[in-house]
Amino acid sequence: MNRSGISKKRPPPSNTPPPAGKHRATGDSTPSPAIGTLDDEFMMEEDVFLDETLLYGDEDEESLILRDIEERESRSSAWARPPLSPAYLSNSQSIIFQQLEIDSIIAESHKELLPGSSGQAPIIRMFGVTREGNSVCCFVHGFEPYFYIACPPGMGPDDISNFHQSLEGRMRESNKNAKVPKFVKRIEMVQKRSIMYYQQQKSQTFLKITVALPTMVASCRGILDRGLQIDGLGMKSFQTYESNILFVLRFMVDCDIVGGNWIEVPTGKYKKNARTLSYCQLEFHCLYSDLISHAAEGEYSKMAPFRVLSFDIECAGRKGHFPEAKHDPVIQIANLVTLQGEDHPFVRNVMTLKSCAPIVGVDVMSFETEREVLLAWRDLIRDVDPDIIIGYNICKFDLPYLIERAATLGIEEFPLLGRVKNSRVRVRDSTFSSRQQGIRESKETTIEGRFQFDLIQAIHRDHKLSSYSLNSVSAHFLSEQKEDVHHSIITDLQNGNAETRRRLAVYCLKDAYLPQRLLDKLMFIYNYVEMARVTGVPISFLLARGQSIKVLSQLLRKGKQKNLVLPNAKQSGSEQGTYEGATVLEARTGFYEKPIATLDFASLYPSIMMAYNLCYCTLVTPEDVRKLNLPPEHVTKTPSGETFVKQTLQKGILPEILEELLTARKRAKADLKEAKDPLEKAVLDGRQLALKISANSVYGFTGATVGQLPCLEISSSVTSYGRQMIEQTKKLVEDKFTTLGGYQYNAEVIYGDTDSVMVQFGVSDVEAAMTLGREAAEHISGTFIKPIKLEFEKVYFPYLLINKKRYAGLLWTNPQQFDKMDTKGIETVRRDNCLLVKNLVTESLNKILIDRDVPGAAENVKKTISDLLMNRIDLSLLVITKGLTKTGDDYEVKSAHGELAERMRKRDAATAPNVGDRVPYVIIKAAKGAKAYERSEDPIYVLQNNIPIDPNYYLENQISKPLLRIFEPVLKNASKELLHGSHTRSISITTPSNSGIMKFAKKQLSCVGCKVPISNGTLCASCKGREAELYCKNVSQVAELEEVFGRLWTQCQECQGSLHQDVLCTSRDCPIFYRRMKAQKDMAVARQQLDRWSF
């Protein structure tokens, strides 16, 4: 019914599925046609991500099923990739494709490409897509694994033959099951040079050892490390070089292939087998020497039309249990398939168990059995043939769940989801660990030929957020919330009717749609492909591995050009000791009401490495310093005491890599300014960001003591130069800008960080500070060796310097208007404080810095503290989140979030936080002297049981220190003014409903007016006669609470996409959820009071 009460029919649905987008490279793409919108009078906008949704009133279920059968027949052709061109079919055209996945397998040698070969051999497998959108599987033959050892002095051809025989014998003993005719295929004498340390001779003799299979490199290395008995030389152990390089990376380096680039195989250089091994449209075999690798420039910088599948599953769990694949069915799978670079998906469907009411613009596919649902999804994967599979937490939950569920049901044909025939999906537990990211537990699902991109993993790596739920991440990046239905309600919706299952389908589709939106918004595909191109590693390495593999890849490439080899580093952890970090000049804390100019070093650490030629191959050992007698003008002694040769003797590899990266970044930024096409801009922006990150990670690679090639002599030299430059900058500024030097005021450096200094020139206006800042940067840059450069970038005015690495100020880059309020190390940007602290600090800084109203800021703090003590603060503002980096038993000191996670595990192990998750909690009232870890509690549990919060904990442990840091420089007696006084004397504590001793308490009636205990009735004797006044007050209170609850309820309905369905959302990351729950409780209590009136 519409507002006027007249029933209106909704328009019938379209009989045709959404059109498939055109297949082309994204360099010149145009969006697919959008679905037409309908008049607002006909319907509410129910599905936020769709144009609209509707229910079909006139069609019975039988006609819907008949139409569905007709539509299914056309799906395969609508979903299929474009057909191969005649030139491809006749082998008369070179095959050019963008490779996305690259791995290696062990198989029989290709007799036609490698005549005379026999037995097993390593084969490189590359999957990709042509410009036309055809899928490619390329088998590359002939590339062999190898590594190096230094040739012992005096070893000749006969000795090498004896060495070969000894090594072959030991390898045969170690690899008894290998089906190869020869384990050590060749040992050759080659002229190379180790990258470690400066050497005057141009090269030395190495032995290149080529083995039959990649796994044999490690076993051969182990034999040589332990020692080998050689005729004529006795027992000898060897230092190996490049024996820890992954086979795929070795292949890419030697063939000059980088991740995500375009590969060409010329006509006549590839062979097609009659019996194909994959489902790809183009499958062929070639020799590695026939591959042409194209640099990512011009046409070859564009992206192929990759097919991106975003999916989500819903499972019907048992009451009180989180879904488990051994017991609980998969009831819905939502799928969106988009061509990379296009705005609209060309496949939009949801597969449901049992009937589901139609959804406009969505192909609803209903099935009677779970087996049919799972096989339909398997068929979709086969027909659509996605290159990239995305979702949110798919690696840890969705994909493993589907595989295990299919195994439980005995569906043997389900796990054939990859591009290789008869190859089943494999799932194993995995743990990712790095100093930057901490420890994260996950699962590794191998789907051969398809790149899995889990958005939760990418966002974890690239962004620091207080919560990583899909709802919270979507709110942060897309300003869009979603309904979050608790797993316990999903089963009820499934067991309802077609309408409730339709609601579940809309929810499931939203969970498939948001990851696609995030992928586009954060330009993940562009950024990751460009990072792979810049660093030379496969795209899949970027999510699965840390930073060091990227630098190692660049070192190997540059080393190959220079005929250098990398030693296999043996030291770990503490063997090399530690080094002193960067300098932070003493902070002259206070509130500065005059402009503060900031002078920043451009790419400081990379610049130092380039300026002073710091590298593995330019480092001179203390012994060689004495022995080589190098002229002083050709060496540099660093402030940390290390010696490096200058470029006049030898240019370092690391400085060369850095020069190329920074030059390429300048070029990419210049091209970005000129670019007009949005897709070209996305590629160039991704490239310049990748180049910047890569340049900055080179220094970290040398300082990682557990890395591939640590060298603390380099990293300690870099930081010592950095310290020296910060101190030199301070001296030069304060010596030059003085009244004696003709300036109006004496300049003062008030703070210096790793790569920047803050200067107060004494002038009162921003423009004058900017002029002096530019002059200072130019003057000081002239005293440093190029390319070290000091730049003037910004002015802070006013500026609140709290202490080291903690400050806030208004940032100006032009004198007319400030750009933003910039903070560092303050609770506005820290993620382990509750939202109340962040909001209060932000409000205070706004009033102090922007409004220049310190008394107003103080009054706002007092009011907030009073609200906290009187229990008037939303619970959502008091939630603290901390990352769970290990299990409770592994923590040396008990922590609030660690102990809560253990308690939640005892309540419900399935929904309890795991290692790597962030745990939300609040601190509750408890016995005097109880520790914080004993008082942490789950916010939902607190709401459900009306457990009182401990306001004093929040005042003393969360609010007081951040506030005093801000107010002490601007407010006299800040502690007394803000934390003591009349506003702190009244405290209200909630009575718990059913926890602790309250389980045994007997409730006592109290007077509605004055709250004194009474035996019956509504009012005490003293309040009799005030019935009208108190009743009206009670009615008014109920009406007010109903209005508050109604507004919150409507807000939640709008978020879920329907104004005529109950709200089911229980999102822990949404402040509205906590407010709605509290309003509902308050309203129920007020109604109980009202019901006590007997008239």
Curated annotation (Swiss-Prot):
Cofactor note: Binds 1 [4Fe-4S] cluster.
Location of region: Disordered: 1-37
Binding positions for Zn(2+) per the UniProt entry: C1007, C1010, C1020, C1023
Keyword Acyltransferase: no
Compartment(s) of residence: Nucleus
GO annotations of cellular component type: delta DNA polymerase complex
Binding residues for [4Fe-4S] cluster: C1052, C1055, C1065, C1070
Key words, A-Z: 4Fe-4S, DNA replication, DNA-binding, DNA-directed DNA polymerase, Exonuclease, Hydrolase, Iron, Iron-sulfur, Metal-binding, Nuclease, Nucleotidyltransferase, Nucleus, Transferase, Zinc, Zinc-finger
One of the record's GO molecular function terms: 4 iron, 4 sulfur cluster binding
Enzyme nomenclature, EC number: 2.7.7.7
Zn finger intervals (CysA-type): 1007-1023
Keyword Zinc-finger set for record: yes
Subunit structure: Heterodimer with subunits of 125 kDa and 50 kDa. The 125 kDa subunit contains the polymerase active site and most likely the active site for the 3'-5' exonuclease activity.
Further comment: In eukaryotes there are five DNA polymerases: alpha, beta, gamma, delta, and epsilon which are responsible for different reactions of DNA synthesis.
Free-text note regarding domains: The CysB motif binds 1 4Fe-4S cluster and is required for the formation of polymerase complexes.
Protein name (Swiss-Prot/TrEMBL): DNA polymerase delta catalytic subunit
Organism whose genome encodes this protein: Arabidopsis thaliana
Gene name of the encoded protein: POLD1
